[in-house]
Amino acid sequence: MDMANLTWLHGQPQSTGVLKANPEDFVVVEDLGFEPDGEGEHVLVNIRKNGCNTQFVADYLARFAGIHARSVSYAGLKDRHAVTEQWFCLHLPGKETPDFTQFSLEGCEVLASARHLRKMRIGTLKGNAFTLVLRHISDRQDVEPRLQAIATGGVPNYFGSQRFGRGGNNLVMARRWANDEIRVKERSKRSFYLSASRSALFNLIASRRLANQQQHTVLEGDALQLSGRGSWFVAKPEELEALQQRLDAGELMITAPLPGDGEPGTAGEALSFEQQCLLEQPELMALLKRERVDPARRALLLQPKNMHWEWWDDATVELRFWLPAGSFATSVVREIMRQDSSDADISE
């Protein structure tokens, strides 16, 4: 998916710059949101890795512990070309905890380990703390007010380009699958292609909403979330004024759909708007319905927390912030500057 065609919240950046001149410029630390239980048949292992992708480390951990690869899980994928502190979960019923002082893998260091009662699954994560270094910035005078605007007003909650695969290949394959040009039997590929389809449709609708300058306006029938919560409710006509006040106060968030086969969660004006957008992508919608993908909702805007920055010089800034799981750091960077390296990304 071409991220360049999506609407900006703070206008198109004028400055250019470089993200990830080296892996140390992109540091991600997982925030579990809980402490390990200290007992149980699972072992949580926190590993700092540089130059290794998530699945490669998971497979190595399985061999190290003498267990099947399926017995190692994690909360989400992390980019290879970055420094990441990530938790892995080893299922070791009736087995001793491995001696992680003997763990040796180039680019990796075990930081901590502890027993836990429950398996770590995809999404078992509160969020991620990021430290990014943006280099070769061409216009500090354009970037500085953008940083201030993002700290207070957030960014569009777009899925980053990594969701769509290298060169957007996951979306290309999803379209071919939708048109019956290929058969997709492998479970992981089916998941990737369906996820790319939903993400592309979310980005489309979110972008249209921003283009209409309605990102801060409650529409009749909107699906609204309590800030920081997953459930939503529909805005009724007689409640619009009160709901608008709550949105303005930061209590509520407008959502956009992750479409699927089922009720979209909106009504009235909001439903009509979303359906009109989805008419532009009939292939992807047909695929999601055919594969019985459950619909969901996602916040339209993303507010980085604990955001602060330090200019090292007029062309280099270090940026720190926290994002909830499932959000993309490059959706923040995209509002700051134009840059070529868009794959150093994921916060899932």
From Swiss-Prot:
This is tRNA pseudouridine synthase D. HAMAP family: TruD. GO terms for molecular function: RNA binding; tRNA pseudouridine(13) synthase activity. One of its GO terms (biological process) is tRNA pseudouridine synthesis. It holds the Pfam family TruD. It is an enzyme of class 5 (isomerase). Transmembrane segments: none annotated. Substrate binds at F26, N128, F328. Belongs to the pseudouridine synthase TruD family. The active site is at D79 (nucleophile). Its EC number is 5.4.99.27. Responsible for synthesis of pseudouridine from uracil-13 in transfer RNAs. The keyword Isomerase applies.
